[in-house]
């Protein structure tokens, strides 16, 4: 089974595809979609086109998205919600369903502490997947963490 994890952002959208087979997790690919255009409509189109390319290239069975954290300023939250809505619609069209996890759920699933720092989450991602190189930016390790959280949830059900 292949799981796509997404950490939506207003400038960078982290993504990761992991394989979950025989209780073993492995990283297939990870990166980020760099949102460089200035008009919102173009940003949404760029994001959706990049997601389409990922879904075309990899046979994804499940998708998990990190929920929006409301600590940002209201304008950023609204923009992020628009990106998330566009992502959600595309995923529903292509895959049919997706799961959502709060940052607290992801941190707790990986570190046992819902208030863990992003660096602690990145450390656990590397440890769980036997990754020796640095994962930068943290949007990528967050996306991997979302995918791992979903894999753990699937294992429990």
UniProtKB/Swiss-Prot annotation:
Keywords: Cytoplasm, DNA damage, DNA recombination, DNA repair, DNA-binding, Endonuclease, Hydrolase, Magnesium, Metal-binding, Nuclease. PROSITE patterns: RUVC. InterPro entries: RNaseH-like_sf (IPR012337), RNaseH_sf (IPR036397), X-over_junc_endoDNase_Mg_BS (IPR020563), X-over_junc_endoDNase_RuvC (IPR002176). It catalyses: Endonucleolytic cleavage at a junction such as a reciprocal single-stranded crossover between two homologous DNA duplexes (Holliday junction). Signal peptide: none annotated. One of its GO terms (biological process) is DNA repair. This is Crossover junction endodeoxyribonuclease RuvC. It comes from Helicobacter pylori (strain ATCC 700392 / 26695). The gene is ruvC.
């Amino acid at each position: 089974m292949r799981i796509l994890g997404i950490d939506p952002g207003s400038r960078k959208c982290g993504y990761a595809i992991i394989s979950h087979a025989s209780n073993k997790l492995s990283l297939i690919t990870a990166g980020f979609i760099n949102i460089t255009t200035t008009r919102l409509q173009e940003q949404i189109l760029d994001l959706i086109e990049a997601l389409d390319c990922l879904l075309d290239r990899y046979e994804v069975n499940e998708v998990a998205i990190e929920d929006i954290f409301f600590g940002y300023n209201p304008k950023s939250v609204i923009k992020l919600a628009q990106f998330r809505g566009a992502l959600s619609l595309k995923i529903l069209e292509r895959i049919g369903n997706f799961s959502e996890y709060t940052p607290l759920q992801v941190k707790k699933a990986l570190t046992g502490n819902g208030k863990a720092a992003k660096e602690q989450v990145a450390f656990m991602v590397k440890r769980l997947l036997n990754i020796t190189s640095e994962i930068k930016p943290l949007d990528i390790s967050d996306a991997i963490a979302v995918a791992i959280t979903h894999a753990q949830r699937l294992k429990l059900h």
